[in-house]
Structures are given as structure tokens and as C-alpha cells.
Amino acid sequence: MQLDSRSKRRSLSMRALVFLCAQLTCVNAYSEQSAVISVYHHVSTSTPASTSLSPEAFRAHLRFLAENDFTVLPVTEIIGELNRGGELPNKLVAITFDDGYESIYSTAFPLLQEFGFPFTVFISTGPIDRQQKGYMTWEQLALLRDAGVIIGNHGTEHKSMLEQSLDQARADIRNAQSRITAELGPQPHLFAYPYGEYSNASKQLIAELGYIGFAQSSGATGPTTDQTALPRFPLAGIYAGLEGAALKYSTLAFDAEMRAPESAETSLSAPSATIRFGAGAYSRARIACFDEGEPMKIAWKGTAEGSDEATITTTQRERGRRWNYVCTAPHRDQNRYFWFSQPWFDSSKPL
């Protein structure tokens, strides 16, 4: 059975439910305006462990979604519904892959067909043009397209946005989109940042070029989420376990944003961050923030319940090039967590 036919039926079902809820008060049908986007790379046991999960683990993720009443839709449909101000179904998910590895076609695709789940693949076109070992071919990508899979832009040569000028990045993105269009026909303007790295200037470039941007920082997506850097939960390597994946797939979008500093780029190993937390079905007194799993100090401007802004601080530690601060709060009435993460990038460190 083709992915596109099932996806269309899910889409029609969602629109029908939205209509019914417009006529009735569907308080329980929609809990929060929220969707979780996951990102995978390899589905294999013979590829780098940090970006891989086994076929058995991937099947377990899909079975969890199927058996626990999740709705899986294409990212384009979710973004469109958010931008229209429409209602989103409870427990909504989009599945994505980065890079265009061969195991996506040979292993992940049949499993996703089995469950009838739509998905998106972000490809770097250079390795595919060179027929580089381990990557899909254009012929395989055409078969995915024919099954309703969305093919997104991951640049031409998978270069970090922090390692090239804006003119170079613009040319790289446009070239990749041209190759995708030439081989597969028009595709939505979706761009996943290589390595998940971006600057304020590169986010502005993505908006200028008319793309929706996808990051690799954890968290769910809601109406106020920055669409030049939508969060995605990486679910591979040490994060491939079903217990952790189940928790993350169940999270809710936190209406939160970093107010200071103004950029995620830093040369500090322990930058402080001032975060604005919007209203939601949670107690601000129960917000907890973490740095690599360690609790952070939270200093509210006033009392927690009387303020919407807090500064979070951490201790000095050795860092790599990328890390995240994570803030969560339990939902008042559901066994789910609001989840926000703030990524940091130190481009002086090696990739």
C-alpha cells in the first residue's frame, strides 16, 4: 500500500475532525497546539552509532506511535495548519530523515510503508550526484517521491552555515534546490541545517529565500515556534531507546524563547540565558532546566508565578562544538511535558 494514499486519508480525517470540533466543543480532542518532529539518519547496525538505530529499534518507535493513538502527518501539512490558525490533533508527529542515506530507502521506507506513515527526507545533493557509497540514488529518491515522500534541501555538500559566507550559503542552497527540481520536480522549500548549526544571519537568509528551516535541537513545535529553526528530536545513538523516544514523542510545545543573549553562537563554555516563558497549562514553579542532564539554577525576575522571565545559569565544563540547555515543565492534567531547548554553537571548535 502506498504512503500517499494513506497520508491523504489521514489528511481528510484530520480536516473532518477539525470541522466537527468547530460545530461542537471538542475540549478533549485537542489538548495543545503542538506537534513533535523527529529526525533520523541511518536505520542500520553497520553505520556510525551516534547517528544510527537498528531496524528493530526503529520498528519499535513506529509501533509505539501506531499503538498509542498518534497522528503522523507530513511536516508541510502541520506547518500549513499552524499558519492558518487551525486546530491540531492531539499527539501529532512528523518524521524526518537527514542526509539521504541508502538505509532510508532499503530499511526505513518498507517499515514506514507497513505502518502507513508519511515522512520527509532532507538530502545533500552532491554525494548523490557523485553516486557516493552509502547514499541513495536519484532513481531511489524518485520512487520515494512517487510514494508521497517529501524531499527537502540539506545543502549541496553538507556544509555548516557557520563555515561559509552568506553568499556561499545562498548559492549552495539554490544549487541543491535546482538539482532536486531537475531530478524530482518541484518540492516544498524546506531546509534542514547541516549539523543543526545556524546563526541569526543564516536564519534571516532562510526566510529571505522562502524556506522553512529545521534545526536539530530538541523540543516540540507550536504556533509561536520560530519557523526558521523548527526543533526536531534526534532519536539515534544514545537517544534511540524506546523509553526516551516515547517520552519525547509525547512532549508539548513550550511557548518560550531566549531573550538574551541575542545569538546561539558563543565562545563561552557556560553562557547564561534569559528565557521568556509564556502562559500554559503548567506551573512556573515546576519548570526545571538542565545542562547535559545536570540541573541549572533558575533566577526569576520576581516570583516564579508572578513573572514570565528567568535567567538560567550553569557551571563551567568542557564543551564540544554544540550543546543544548533544556527546560521542561509537567502538564497540569496530562502525563506529558512541555519541552524547550536552547542550542549553543562554538564555531571555534572542530566539526
Regions found by a protein language model. Give the residues of each.
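Beta->alpha turn/N-cap motifs
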Residues: 76, 216-217
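Soluble mature domains adjacent to a membrane tether on cell-surface and organelle-surface proteins
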Residues: 212-216, 226
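Short, structured coil segments at secondary-structure junctions
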Residues: 115, 209-210
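Metal-dependent polysaccharide deacetylase catalytic core of the NodB/CE4 family, i.e.
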Residues: 33-52, 68-71, 81-93, 101-204, ...
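Terminal accessory/targeting
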Residues: 2-91, 110-119, 125-136, 235-351
